Amino acid sequence: VDYLAELDPDALRGARIGVLRKHGVSAQPDVEAAFDRALEALKALGAELVDADIATAGQWNDAEFEMLLYEFRHGLDAYLAASGAPVRSLAELIEYNKAHADREMPLFGQELFERAQAKGPLTDRAYRDARDKARRLAKAEGIDATLARQRLDALVVPTAGPAWPIDPVNGDHFTGAGYGVAAVAGTPSI
């Protein structure tokens, strides 16, 4: 299939694209340089670039984390049950890790596993409330409101920076990612 044959070279002419400068990867000069080149390419194709901001940015974080704990347990339990792995659930994995802590957890614990294990099913009111709040803040009051308020056709943001080195002493050196709002909102991020 030749997808390029179907592309319209004038598709971006006149499109208003919101640039989310505060919601992507922070302090990554190579990423910023690549992003600037991409913005120049969009302008060269006729797009109008507009600085944009999602007013609710970060307000969904607590609700999103609550969702993560519920969904992690639910998803991992389903995966392990079907995988043929020697452990069949998150609860079994936690117990395995405890029994082999010197080998499985020499540098860190399993606090997130244990917090996820303490959550109930995806039908719990707390889960549904967190899901609804996160989606409302990220989608209706976030992405959708930003698009409407500024009459934008799309938003653009760097999705992620380069992988960071593994640091078993100080932990991850995560520098941010622009895909989070789209993931929480349930909207495409391409």
Where are these regions (language model features)?
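Glycine-rich, small-residue loops and helix-cap segments
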Residues: 31, 41-44, 114-190
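Gly/Ser-rich, acidic/histidine-flanked active-site/gating loops
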Residues: 1-86
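A short beta-alpha structural unit
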Residues: 56-66, 98, 128, 163-165
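Surface-exposed patches in mature extracellular/periplasmic domains of secreted proteins
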Residues: 51-54, 86-93, 142-144, 157-158
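Short helix-loop capping/hinge segments that flank enzyme active sites or metal/cofactor-binding pockets
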Residues: 4-21, 70-139
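Generic preference for flexible, low-structure residues
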Residues: 13, 33, 65, 92, ...
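Short, solvent-exposed coil/turn linker segments
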Residues: 2, 53, 89-92, 154, ...
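Proteins with a high burden of low-complexity, intrinsically disordered sequence enriched in S/T/G/P/A and R
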Residues: 1, 17, 40-44, 50-51, ...
